[in-house]
Curated annotation (Swiss-Prot):
Identification of the protein by name: Chalcone--flavanone isomerase
Extra facts: Part of the biosynthetic pathway for all classes of flavonoids, a large class of secondary plant metabolites, many of which are brightly colored.
Cross-referenced InterPro entries: CFI, Chalcone_isomerase, Chalcone_isomerase_3-sand, Chalcone_isomerase_bundle_sf, Chalcone_isomerase_sf
Record organism: Hordeum vulgare
Reactions accelerated catalytically: a chalcone = a flavanone
Gene name tied to this protein: CHI
Record: residues binding substrate: 46, 112, 189
Entry keywords, A to Z: Flavonoid biosynthesis, Isomerase
Amino acid sequence: MAVSELEVDGVVFPPLARPPGSAHAHFLAGAGVRGMEIGGHFIKFTAIGVYLQADAAVSALAAKWAGKPAADLASDAAFFRDVVTGEFEKFTRVTMILPLTGAQYSDKVTENCVAYWKAAGVYTDAEAAAVDKFKEAFGPHSFAPGASILFTHSPAGVLTVAFSKDSSVPESGGVAIENARLCEAVLESIIGEHGVSPAAKLSLANRVAELLKGAAHAGGEPAAEPVPVSV
């Protein structure tokens, strides 16, 4: 199956991307909005695209999930956990729909992470230091609509944080944070069991199910086909 681009609330996610500092191309696995019901209205804050390493993700996920319908993947927390923890790179692009400060974003993300780690009894000095470095990376930034936050999640447990004033992806740069729990937690907060973007989760389940089906038949990796489709 060819991989198409997705448009989410006017934000276009191309079918392929190469994260800052990565040697690997990534395909668009899914995309959707993050929003919240406020006063009876659904307010959209960000559009989120999740990319997976093209030369490793499909084969890694196929062993357990190939042949299963999208509905099964979408309803199974273990599938999303396998995406988060899989031995392949992931790349997440968060593009603003409404303006947001770096402090607002980083405080909310780390607040949820720390609460989870403390409840699980795994919050150590290493996690505290990683959280501080994460907040420092965001401190001087404010994000206008259209600006993007870029996360590269390494299977070695390194989270690279970069920024763009638009939807472009810089070839290099960013802040590298070596902490496996934080690296996983950022993606887990988006597509995990209590992920903030159900739309991105559903999109990812639908597209990966088709890719696994196509890979099983063709024995190959996804190719790019830049044709807009709905989420």
